[in-house]
């Protein structure tokens, strides 16, 4: 009986080790491109079929180093996106230690630029140093701010896209600027005049933001898509019920990105793959 129990224990240990190894391997692999369609109410005709890339939770670290970052950039640029949006958690570590690992992101290319918002992890390190470094890479971080892009379709018709980014609520712990939708959209074109896209790292505040401002699409990350199959319920509890994919509230749509990278403090993915999201806009039918 003792021998049988020992064999059983060894078998369980071996299976657990195998799953852990598979999870780490999946977690650190270069993410695949996944295509999604966002159905937007009252989408301007000139933006029908407009595609952009969303990255999130890159978490450049001692685990996800320069070769991984380079692979992500190559896959994104191969899509020739019109626009690249990065919804926070760029890095883990100091600028000095991670400078080489984030360097490839300077090579991201898109006709209408590369834009981002901060995540909670930016606040754990030298926040201002990282904001300067990310901007130096050519990624314009919108902190309670917006910009207006004049987007043209292949037929030459144009429409305004109002792109906004919120500060992250983690700022409260460090006495930094909190998310402020009123400030973010101050002076912005009305939602009937421009398509408003809001970048906000944490998805759980989506209903609150919908009540405070008018926008068509919110892009978030943070949850890593649950990271392990079967953890959806636990992840949903601490994230307002949002885990990954599309959600609709009050006429607005949100996409929760499952993450392009992952945090090196828990470097395992099983059944919740990372991704490079290629999102196509289309008008929602009545």
Regions found by a protein language model. Give the residues of each.
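N-terminal secretory signal peptides and thylakoid transit peptides that target proteins
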Residues: 2-15
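C-terminal segment of N-terminal export signals and the immediately downstream linker at the start
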Residues: 11, 21-50, 63-67, 74
């Amino acid at each position: 009986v003792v021998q049988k129990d020992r064999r059983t224990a060894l078998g369980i240990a071996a299976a657990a080790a195998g799953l852990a190894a598979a999870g780490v391997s999946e977690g650190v692999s270069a993410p695949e491109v996944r295509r999604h369609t966002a159905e937007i109410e009252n989408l301007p005709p000139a933006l029908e079929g407009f595609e952009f890339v969303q990255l999130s939770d890159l978490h450049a670290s001692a685990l996800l180093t320069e070769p991984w970052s380079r692979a992500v950039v190559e896959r994104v640029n191969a899509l020739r996106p019109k626009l690249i949006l990065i919804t926070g958690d760029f890095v883990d570590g100091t600028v000095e230690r991670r400078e080489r690992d984030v360097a490839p992101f300077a090579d991201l290319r898109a006709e209408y630029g590369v834009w981002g918002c901060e995540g909670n992890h930016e606040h754990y390190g030298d926040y201002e140093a990282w904001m300067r470094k990310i901007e130096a890479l050519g990624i314009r971080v919108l902190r309670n701010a917006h910009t207006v892009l004049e987007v043209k379709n292949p037929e030459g018709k144009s429409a305004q896209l109002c792109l906004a980014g919120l500060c992250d609520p983690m700022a409260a712990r460090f006495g930094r600027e909190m998310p402020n939708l009123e400030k973010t959209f101050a002076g912005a074109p009305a939602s009937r005049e421009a398509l408003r896209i809001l970048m906000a790292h944490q998805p759980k505040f989506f209903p609150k933001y919908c009540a405070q401002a008018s926008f068509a699409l919110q892009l978030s990350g943070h949850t890593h898509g649950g990271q392990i199959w079967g953890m959806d319920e636990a992840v949903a509890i601490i994230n307002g019920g949002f885990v990954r994919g599309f959600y609709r509230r009050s006429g607005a749509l949100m996409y929760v990105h499952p993450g392009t990278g992952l945090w090196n403090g828990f470097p395992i993915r099983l059944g919740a793959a990372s991704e490079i999201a290629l999102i196509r806009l289309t008008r929602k039918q009545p």
